[in-house]
């Protein structure tokens, strides 16, 4: 069985080494297609792959049509927006993703951007602290929860709106829940 990792923007060496260890210990072959610049390279590489791992690379109907042995496609990340699920289904190819995989990195980036903007690095000497400020979080999923925890650690007042998460759960985590989305943005 051949597992293809195809990424225009490569995974870290540590991630590839981890994938390689798992794949080879299972007795399978790992193939890498990194930094490809032509979709034909992707078509050629996927032709004999049994499994495909991608990041945000587009797995279109055309890619699927070039995959003669493909049984599974794994998107390293949340969502399926880059996978043609209808094409996968038509060929009985399992499509999976890894929700939450990068949640902490995304939450850290959000906090980092808040710090950057609060310090007003565009005009040195005019910045402020985040402590005591209010942050509004639109969606309280994996990333939203982590942003809330990090913001609270910085002394921020955290508000969040998510119609799919019970108000009691958010309040139990010290988050203020506005009645409407409009109130969050007010």
Predicted region positions:
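Short acidic active-site motifs
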Residues: 38-42, 58-62, 83, 179-183
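Rossmann-like dinucleotide/phosphate-binding beta-alpha-beta segment
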Residues: 128-186
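Structural detector of well-ordered beta-strand residues that form the stable sheet scaffold
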Residues: 4, 72-74, 94-96, 136, ...
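Well-formed, non-transmembrane alpha-helical positions, independent of function
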Residues: 22, 63, 86-87, 169, ...
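Short beta->alpha connector loops
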Residues: 9-12, 34-38, 55-59, 77-80, ...
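Phosphate/diphosphate ligand-binding glycine-rich loop within oxidoreductases
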Residues: 31, 50-127
């Amino acid at each position: 069985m051949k597992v293809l990792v195809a990424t225009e923007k490569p995974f870290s060496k540590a991630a590839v080494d981890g994938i390689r260890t798992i794949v080879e210990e299972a007795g399978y072959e790992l193939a890498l297609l990194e930094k490809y610049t032509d979709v034909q390279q992707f078509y050629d590489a996927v032709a004999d792959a049994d499994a495909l791992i991608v990041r945000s690379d587009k797995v279109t109907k055309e890619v699927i049509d070039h995959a003669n042995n493909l049984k599974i496609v794994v998107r390293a990340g949340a969502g399926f927006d880059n996978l043609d699920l209808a094409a996968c289904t038509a060929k009985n190819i399992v499509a999976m993703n890894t929700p939450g995989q990068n949640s902490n990195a995304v939450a850290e980036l959000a906090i980092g951007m808040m710090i950057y903007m609060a310090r007003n690095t565009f005009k040195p000497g005019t910045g402020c602290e985040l402590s005591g400020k209010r942050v509004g979080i639109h969606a309280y999923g994996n990333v939203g929860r982590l942003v809330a925890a990090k913001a609270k650690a910085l002394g921020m007042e955290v508000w969040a709106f998510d119609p799919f998460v019970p108000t009691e759960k958010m309040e139990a985590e010290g988050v203020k829940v506005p009645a409407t989305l409009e109130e969050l943005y007010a």
